């Protein structure tokens, strides 16, 4: 009993022991989570990297594929946007998949439907132009602002507006939400770098380091 009474006092006298124990615990938890993520990525790899219904940019034959789950109303997605662009452009050997994952309300859903409709009707180059516009757009996203974007870019506004409500668009969003749920992704941005998943914003230099590590692992 006396030993039991003394243990709390010993911890108070040596708090670094508790700090070290917490550090070891957190590292083990992170390692276990990484293993679970890796197993899930392997199981779902075909769905993740086939990019059915998604825009694919960068080098289509790149040796590393980055997948981004994003939302146009997400502040951290907007912060990551120029850095992802810079990474892909400067590297030259990255395949980028953008998965529309609207989770921040009706404006997010509206923007995602618009972008997917453009991809389906006008093609990947048109999607990229719209994606760039939406990632930097100020103010609310509504039907009028989206119609103005489509008109400015020379697209068929009526066709795109009609397509936005098509089941083909709904299926893409539903598939991305289902995939995110299975991957335990519930926030944006979330990234997949080859066989590593990172939830949340990643600075440019950190992304470069992850890509380098993925290449080194082969």
Outline where the language-model segments fall.
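Acidic/His-rich structured neighborhood in mature extracellular/periplasmic domains
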Residues: 47, 72-76
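C-terminal cap of thioredoxin/glutaredoxin-like
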Residues: 1-9, 17, 28, 148-218
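Envelope-exposed proteins and targeting segments
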Residues: 62-65, 70, 92, 194
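Structural alpha/beta surface segment adjacent to cysteine/selenocysteine redox centers
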Residues: 67, 78-151, 181-186, 217-218
């Amino acid at each position: 009993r006396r030993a039991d009474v003394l243990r709390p006092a010993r911890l108070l006298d040596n708090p670094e022991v508790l700090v070290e124990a917490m550090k070891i615990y957190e590292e083990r938890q992170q390692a276990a989570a990484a293993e679970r993520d890796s197993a899930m990525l392997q199981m779902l790899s075909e769905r993740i990297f086939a990019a059915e219904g998604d825009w694919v940019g960068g080098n289509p034959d790149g040796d590393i594929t980055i997948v981004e789950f994003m939302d146009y109303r997400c502040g951290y997605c907007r912060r990551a946007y120029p850095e992802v662009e810079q990474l892909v452009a400067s590297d030259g050997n990255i395949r980028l998949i953008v998965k529309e994952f609207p989770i921040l309300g009706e404006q997010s859903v509206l923007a995602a439907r618009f972008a997917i409709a453009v991809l389906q009707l006008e093609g990947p180059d048109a999607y990229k132009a719209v994606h760039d516009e939406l990632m930097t757009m100020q103010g609310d996203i509504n039907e009028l602002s989206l119609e103005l974007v489509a008109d400015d870019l020379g697209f068929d506004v009526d066709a795109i507006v009609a397509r936005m409500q098509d089941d083909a668009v709904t299926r893409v969003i539903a598939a991305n939400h289902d995939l995110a749920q299975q991957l335990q992704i519930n926030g944006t941005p979330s990234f997949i770098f080859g066989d590593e998943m990172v939830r949340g914003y990643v600075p440019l230099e950190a992304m470069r380091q992850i890509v380098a590590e993925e290449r080194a692992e082969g």
